[in-house]
Amino acid sequence: MNFSKVFALVLLIGLVLLTGHTEAGGLKKLGKKLEGVGKRVFKASEKALPVVTGYKAIGK
């Protein structure tokens, strides 16, 4: 397939998704899941970072 055809197809799908009058139920659920993952990663890094820096200080 030609690149321009693939690009046109992707552009068309993107326009349909962005301008469609569908409810945001599915996208909202996905966004909430991603937000939850981000919060969990942030909290885990807050807990682990002092441990790692303390471990590095002991190793010096």
UniProtKB/Swiss-Prot annotation:
According to its record, what are the GO cellular component terms?
extracellular space
> Is Secreted among the key words of this record?
yes
The UniProt transmembrane annotation reads: none
- Per the annotation, which location comes first and is thus the protein's main one? secreted
Alphabetical list of InterPro entries matching this protein: Cecropin, Cecropin_insect
Annotated function: Putative antimicrobial peptide. Partially neutralizes lipopolysaccharides (LPS). Exhibits anti-inflammatory properties: inhibits LPS-induced iNOS/NOS2 transcription, nitric oxide (NO) and pro-inflammatory cytokine production in mouse macrophages and human peripheral blood mononuclear cells (PBMCs); inhibits LPS-induced activation of MAPK and NF-kappa-B signaling pathways in mouse macrophages.
Q: What is this protein called?
A: Cecropin-B1
Which organism does this record belong to?
A: Aedes aegypti (Yellowfever mosquito)
